[in-house]
Amino acid sequence: MILKYLKQFGLVLLLFSFYTSKGQNNLTYEALISEASLLHLQKDYKNAIPKLEKAFSIEKPDALNAYKAAGMYSLDENKTKAFQYLDLSLDRGWTETDQLLIDPYFDFIRNNYPEEWKAITQKSHLKEQEYEKTLLLPELRKQIIAMGIEDQKIRYSKIQTSDPAQLNELQQKINELDFKNLSTAKEILKKHGWLKMSQIGKDGAHNFWLIVQHSDQDILFQKTALHEMEKLKGTKELDMENYAFLYDRVQCNLNYKQLYGTQVNWTQNGEASGFRGILKENETDKRRTALRMLPLKIYALNYGFNYTLPTASDVAKKDKKDKEDTLNLISLAKKYCVTKEFQKVYENYNNASMILGGMTSAQNFEAAELFAKIYNQTNEEQYRSIALDFLSLNHLRGDLNLKLLLSNTAFQKFYSESRWKNIVSSL
């Protein structure tokens, strides 16, 4: 399924979003482009091409959408249109030659028209060389773009196979690459702060953001990167849409509601079912407009679902229900604790913790203490593990007090556990 493809491939929708003009005001155009973008990912060129051409009759394509059109026409084995739109894409600012060289959408024209392909890639190289002369750190840009391409290549390979052994092998490679990229990104951030567009270009900055966005295994690093991004707010050195995505990503990773509606929910079948919880959701489009982002109803089309902005009354009702559901689940958990039905305690607290923006840091600590006491009675590892989960979340939020933690005798059996040591040593 295509939406499963989207989930596994990561943030592929935004892989080249830095080429897109943020000044588009025609929502009919934007809706057509969003629908075509989904079809582009499905390789459904028969349905994508009419939508793209209809959009282009309203407004001329920017670099990204000309590039997408070229890919669709290549899949359709329409040589003339494919090269026409590739040429236009380069004229409009496409600068990633390495991505062009490996893009599987262009296999048809690459393999069947070598002379024309050589000419277009030479033009791409020249355009990129001219672009690099305008940058302060062109070599670092090359390094970062290579990291981003490698990241996407291996994820693309994963979705092309259904063999369990190959999937396991590829997942291991993805994990290793993520760790490698994370280590490199940390070094870059420490040395340069958040990289400016004048240093590595829009494409380099976007690829660096993509690596950070994928670093969910190190939320503290994501928070640090976000802090560095914030230093550039209000300048022309930062893509504010990238900022919005990382801000929302960090918020959701800390179990808070997002602000800009960039994060979506996924079903077990890999389908995007809607947006994850948004703070004051009825005001989201105002916040997005301030960053020159498209309305949520248009953005949703990229994922294949329809969306209507709720009213303030609807939001108030939803927030009230979330709070009530959280409190009810916690109350049930405490009742089951009294009757020593510890598995039900676990299930209810786990469900409460899954409500975005539901549990406060104080409630997290209370839950950690309760599960520590259950572990002290049962010695069952799942209870110590979930206690540490709640403590880790508070630590990531910056809401964990070392003195208070060490003075609580319920956690004494945790002292030899590695996760406990990591938390305590970093406070």
Q: What do these predicted ranges mean?
A:
Residues 1-30, 34-38:
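Bacterial Sec-dependent N-terminal signal peptides
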Residues 28, 35, 68-69, 332, ...:
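Structural register within alpha-helical repeat arrays
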Residues 30, 64-65, 327, 362:
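Start-of-helix register in tetratricopeptide repeats
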Residues 38, 42, 46, 60-62, ...:
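Preference for long, solvent-exposed alpha-helical segments and helix-linker "stalks"
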Residues 39, 73, 336, 371, ...:
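Residue at a conserved register position within TPR or TPR-like alpha-solenoid repeats
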Residues 55, 89, 352-353, 394:
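Canonical positions in the second alpha-helix
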